[in-house]
From Swiss-Prot:
The encoding gene: rpsS
Listed GO biological process terms: ribosomal small subunit assembly; translation
Function: Protein S19 forms a complex with S13 that binds strongly to the 16S ribosomal RNA.
Protein name as annotated: Small ribosomal subunit protein uS19
Disulfide bonds: none
GO molecular function annotations of the record: rRNA binding; structural constituent of ribosome
Amino acid sequence: MARSIKKGPFVDEHLMKKVEAQEGSEKKQVIKTWSRRSTIFPNFIGHTFAVYDGRKHVPVYVTEDMVGHKLGEFAPTRTFKGHVADDKKTRR
């Protein structure tokens, strides 16, 4: 279910403060965050976030196409190793 339009998009305050602090500086550092639930705003474009996936921080560079999505969508939490191959051919 989508979030109510009345409420507006959600972003953690501490994350917004970190982005606004870097807006004035020339050198953009990687912003480390655990907030996977935060919505990507237009002023996040061009910044790199290190989003926590449960084990490590995954670098996510924000582009125009990502606006409106959540940060957690771009840092998968599960590693897919592939299905086990069928051994019927090798048993014969």
